């Protein structure tokens, strides 16, 4: 004999399998309806196609029990299905199955968009569809949000809290006081220039050129306009003055040569004398060689003849 508890468990598993089949069938029907609407099938043809077909799938025979008794389960309506679920399933699974069985795709999408609109107020329809919201906010507020996120990440890693002001200085976020000081030093800058820290100075080109020409005129006086523009100054000199300067330079040069020659002559003579004396001292005396005269040769021959006689 089969125990009642085991039989109840088997029946419970069978009913759960049946519910799963019903859920898959309802999902398939919704998919067919969505495909027909996307293909442009009229509503009358969709209604005609659904006539004559059962609302539930064909009855599926359950597995045979050990007592060789075949049981089938049939739910004529959704009310009976809900009653069965309420009786045999826990509350949590009951709610989850009901929400899955009766959920609508359009309702789910609308709920997601409502949640998105709650998180990002003031967003447009395109922003809702793309899930991207362009925030229009104060840069200081945005910087505070970013610093807060950085602090949260650091605290999650290290487990310690850090001062927001220190994080601002470490990240290089400009303070409002710094921007005010910048505006004081560089007046007339725009908001974008304050944010970027770059100030484009507006200077009149005529004023700038005039100041440069004044500086050039100070360095080289009596300069014409063309000479100021080209940077070349043609000096105007009197020819008589130039010739006089050349004559003076030649006269001074000749005087220098004449004054240098008498003083240099004794020094040159002294050096030559010392050189001659050194050569005389270092010179070696030559040996004198006498050449025999003719008479001496004749006397030698006579003596030789006398020697031969003896």
UniProtKB/Swiss-Prot annotation:
Ranges of biased composition (kind: Basic and acidic residues): 270-282
Protein name, UniProt field: Protein FAM153A
Biased composition range(s): Low complexity: 259-268
InterPro entries per record: FAM153
Family membership: Belongs to the FAM153 family.
Disordered: annotated span: 39-58, 108-136, 156-184, 250-297
PANTHER family the record matches: FAMILY WITH SEQUENCE SIMILARITY 153 MEMBER C-RELATED, PROTEIN FAM153A-RELATED
Biased composition (Basic residues): 283-297
């Amino acid at each position: 004999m089969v125990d009642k508890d085991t039989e109840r468990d088997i029946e419970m598993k069978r009913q759960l399998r049946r519910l799963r089949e019903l859920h898959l069938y309802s999902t398939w029907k919704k998919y067919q309806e969505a495909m027909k609407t996307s293909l442009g099938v009229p509503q009358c043809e969709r209604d005609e196609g659904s006539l004559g077909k059962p609302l539930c799938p064909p009855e599926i025979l359950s597995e045979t029990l050990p007592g060789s008794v075949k049981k089938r389960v049939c739910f004529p309506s959704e009310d009976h299905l809900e009653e069965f679920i309420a009786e045999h399933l826990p509350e949590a699974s009951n709610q989850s199955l009901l929400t899955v069985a009766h959920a609508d795709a359009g309702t789910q999408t609308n709920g997601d968009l409502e949640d998105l609109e709650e998180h990002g107020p003031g967003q447009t329809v395109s922003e809702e569809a793309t899930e991207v919201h362009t925030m229009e906010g104060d840069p200081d507020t945005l910087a505070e949000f970013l610093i807060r996120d950085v602090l949260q990440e650091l605290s999650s890693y290290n487990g310690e809290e850090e001062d927001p002001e220190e994080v601002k200085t470490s990240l290089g976020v400009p303070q409002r006081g710094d921007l005010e000081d910048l505006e004081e030093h560089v007046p007339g800058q725009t908001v974008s220039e304050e944010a970027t820290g770059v100030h484009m100075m507006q200077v009149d080109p005529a004023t700038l050129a005039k100041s440069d020409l004044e500086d050039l005129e100070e360095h080289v006086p009596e300069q014409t306009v063309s000479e100021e523009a080209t940077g070349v100054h043609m000096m105007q000199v009197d020819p008589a003055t130039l010739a006089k300067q050349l004559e003076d330079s030649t006269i001074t040069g000749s005087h220098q040569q004449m004054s240098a020659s008498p003083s240099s002559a004794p020094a040159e003579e002294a050096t030559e004398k010392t050189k001659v004396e050194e050569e005389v001292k270092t010179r070696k005396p030559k040996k004198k060689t006498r050449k025999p005269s003719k008479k001496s040769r004749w006397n030698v021959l006579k003596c030789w003849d006398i020697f031969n006689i003896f």
